[in-house]
Amino acid sequence: MGDLMKKHEMTEEDIKLQFITPAIEGAGWDKQKQIRMEYNFTDGRVIVRGNVTARGKRKRTDYLLYYKPNIPLAIVEAKDNRHSVGAGMQQAIEYAEVLDIPFVYSSNGDGFLEHDMKTGKERELTLEQFPSPQDLWQRHIGDEHFTPEQEQLITEPYYFQPGDKTPRYYQRIAINRTVDAVARGQDRILLVMATGTGKTYTAFQIIHRLWKSGRKKKILFLADRNILVNQTMQQDFKPFAKVMTKIEGKKLDSSYELYLSLYQQLAGDENEEPFRAFQPDFFDLIVIDECHRGSAKEDSRWRRILEYFHSATQIGMTATPKETKEVSNISYFGEPIYTYSLKQGIDDGFLAPYKVLRVGLDKDLEGWRPTAGQHDIYGYEIEDREYNTKDYDKNLIIDERTTAVAKRITRFLKENDRFAKTIVFCVDIDHAERMRQALVNENSDLVAENAKYVMRITGDNAEGKAQLDYFIAEDSKYPVIVTTSKLMTTGVDCKTCRLIVLDNNINSMTEFKQIIGRGTRLKPDYGKEYFTIMDFRNACRLFADPEFDGDPISIIDDNDDPGEEPTANPPKPPVPTPGPGGDTDDPPEKKHKFRVRGVEVSILNERVQYYDKDGKLITESVTDYSKKNILGEYATLDSFLRAWNSEEKKQAIIDELQERGILLEALRQIAGNKDIDDFDLICHIAYDKAPLTKAERANNVRKRGYLYKYSGLAQEVLSALLDKYMNEGIQDIENLEILSNDPFRKFGTPMKIAKLFGGKNGYIQAIRDLQKEIYAA
């Protein structure tokens, strides 16, 4: 009975150490190679309010059990013995669904409850009955009837060298599902992964496992931008250096094993198809990066490459599967075997969230109409009708509008960081050039220091395109602001981009997703934990479209913008021919654009929107949002006071509110008073209570004579703690580690200080009493 009571009183950590871990190891699981404890599989969502950011909680499993590295079989969720054996099951199942794990276990140290994700059945096991790795593996593949060759393929190790990054959970799922599909004989495979989630690294591991197993010996990697191919060879595909080549010109060397090429390089034109230099069965595997950009279009020259090598396994990878009358990824590749969306990436903390600044110019919201018989600056009579954002910079140019946009961009950068990498998306090349000029004039001081502060990077401009590598390089200061049209909508890995400006008309969901993807990469060491979208043309309405972040479905969208498809063989001038990388931009408009000056343009309204915990844009002010969510958790002041007073560590309440998107530091900045205590800030925002400063609360404690309950050194310690609260906040005095720092060192070691209060428990009780006194009024 004594032992039972002892077990019942154990912490969860003790239960794991003394019962669960020994049971798992006793079943044959290798502690070093097959058991991963305290596995954090997300980084915690980045929460943004104002300019303040914080991380949400990371998701974590107690145990993740592997058959082989990166081939997980089971999750074990532990609870202390005061819980039932199955108390952790629901949370474990939720994690198993995310992590693609076939078996789930919950334990309180008495035994295990098992849940089979494939059959849905559950059973209880004793500690001694926990299954071995081989038992679970055979159950997992039992219905598949794999041949030895197939099993060897699906267990082929990942490429790994000491110091290498390890795959994130979603990359591991994408890699394993793809290799499994190939093992089963599937020859058309589609993977959908949001921009910035490591598609190229995922492709590398897939290719390496298939190549190393001997299943695929000749491999083609197709991309549509030179920079994509070069980045791939220099970074993720570097381990293939000795067997890898880039197809250039007409030299096709068949001695390599991995070939990288632009679609355009292999496709050629109607009369010349370089891909035919290879035999149709030359390649075993073709991986198509950004496959939405034309490979699945039935009449495209790129599609002919895929059909020519029809016997090869073909894997399409994209952030934005395209489904229109002309193009269908799904009808060609089939349903995606795995989708990892932008929302998932942001929720997991692997992608940067965004805040949206919507700017309403008066001429955009109200329209503009010429006076009767009005001529433009070139002498053309302007067609008499009302013009709006669909016309601006396409049919009609208002110079003052361009200036107004440039001024607002510049003001934003001056208020935040003038060297924040910025991409301005324009209607066409002509608009991008005029916007460049306007931004140069608004930032002439920095342009005088370095002419590359503002650059136009478009398909027709060799000088601008030459600066693209410098723009995306993390250690390169210039260019800072780039104006563009189509060239930078996809494939540009600019981790440091912190401002995206939309001054173009976007009707294509595919293009919208790709543009937003330019900013979603996190770079905390660069100071980038979120990015801002400045929207002048209401493009962000597409965020509300269920199609924006849902699973891809086969749809018809007659409004899809055909202008985003690149071409390898453009018409004769004045349309610009593509550069060496096949990159093209919009051709100049042949129709005359009216251009006017002397039109007064002003900002009519602005609103800031934040990405909330549900993945939606909220328009409320930080204060209003915080008040609503605090009241959602604590409806009355009394309920909040009860929770605050009953919580031993006040930080737990702060953390809970933070998970709901309430950042007290942002509220403190808005209030303009750094000396307000967290408690007072919450009461002031949510319940309209007049706040006291920390100094006022500390002085009230002293005035009431509370410290005189103690004498000697104990009183001095509490007085020092009260000073610490006044200067730092309640979280500091809750932390026992502060006793190891000044000014407490003069009182002795933490153990010696605790003895002044009768021991550790007495010290903790003294801290609780001090907290009650602090918040007594």
Which ranges hold each PLM region?
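ATP-dependent helicase/translocase motor core
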Residues: 2-218, 223, 227-242, 254-258, ...
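Conserved RecA-like P-loop NTPase helicase motor core
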Residues: 82, 265, 293, 455-562
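Structural recognition of the conserved hydrophobic beta-strand(s) that form the central parallel beta-sheet
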Residues: 105-107, 259-262, 313-318, 482-483
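Conserved C-terminal RecA-like helicase domain
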Residues: 257, 388-482
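SF2 helicase catalytic motif II
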Residues: 276-315
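Interdomain helical connector at the RecA1-RecA2 junction of SF1/SF2 helicase-like NTPases
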Residues: 327-420
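A conserved SF2-helicase RecA2
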Residues: 343-348, 352, 522-579, 587-594, ...
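Catalytic cores and motor modules of nucleic-acid processing enzymes
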Residues: 413-414, 431-435, 443, 453, ...
